[in-house]
Regions:
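Helix-to-loop junction immediately C-terminal to a conserved catalytic motif
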Residues: 48
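Conserved ABC transporter NBD signature motif
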Residues: 56-67, 71-72
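Conserved ABC ATPase "signature" region
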Residues: 96, 100, 107-125
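Conserved ABC ATPase signature
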Residues: 129-133
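Conserved catalytic motifs of ABC-family nucleotide-binding domains
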Residues: 150
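Catalytic Walker B motif of ABC-type/P-loop ATPase nucleotide-binding domains
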Residues: 154-157
């Protein structure tokens, strides 16, 4: 597995958020550190194919991710900085909904959701509505959804916020 950023640039109007970034990621754990506004979230969104680069490219195992489409997105698990929860969903319903968006079959989705709720210590509240959860509980639920599809690449933007 290799993820490569090649002269990756993102510009918003006259503001350059990322300027010709080159990096190669092999299997391992990486952290991005930088000041507010340094472009960390922008870089993660480019890696996740949420944003289109102004120039440069992101490749996964030698192929441009923009050409890979669904097959690339299936390899990604992503927890955004400001995750959108559905307050009237239960934890279980939320994970099942996210699993359906990721194209997972219903039986697997239920088994994996129960497993992940146990892993993030939310199994006892799986039938409670998300609006009753603390910030930390919501964050753990977000982490669980990022693992639903057994991703090859896991991108977590401020994963400890609210814990």
């Amino acid at each position: 597995m290799q993820l490569t950023l090649d002269r990756l640039t993102k510009q918003y109007g006259s503001k350059i958020a990322l300027d010709r970034i080159d990096a190669t990621f092999e299997p391992g754990i990486y952290g991005l550190l930088g000041a507010n506004g340094a472009g960390k979230t922008t870089m993660m969104r480019l890696i996740c194919d949420i944003l289109k680069p102004t120039s440069g490219e992101v490749t996964f195992n030698g192929t441009n991710i923009r050409e890979m489409g669904e097959s690339y997105r299936a390899a990604i698990g992503y927890l955004p900085q400001d995750f959108g929860y559905y307050p009237n969903f239960t934890a279980m319903n939320f994970l099942l909904y996210m699993a359906s968006l990721k194209g997972l079959n219903a039986r697997y989705a239920k088994e994996k959701s129960l497993e992940l709720l146990e892993t993030v210590n939310l199994s006892e509240v799986k039938d409670k509505k998300i609006k009753t959860f603390s910030g930390g509980m919501k964050q753990r639920l977000g982490i669980a959804q990022a693992f639903l599809n057994n991703p090859q690449i896991l991108i977590l933007d401020e994963p400890t916020a609210g814990l």
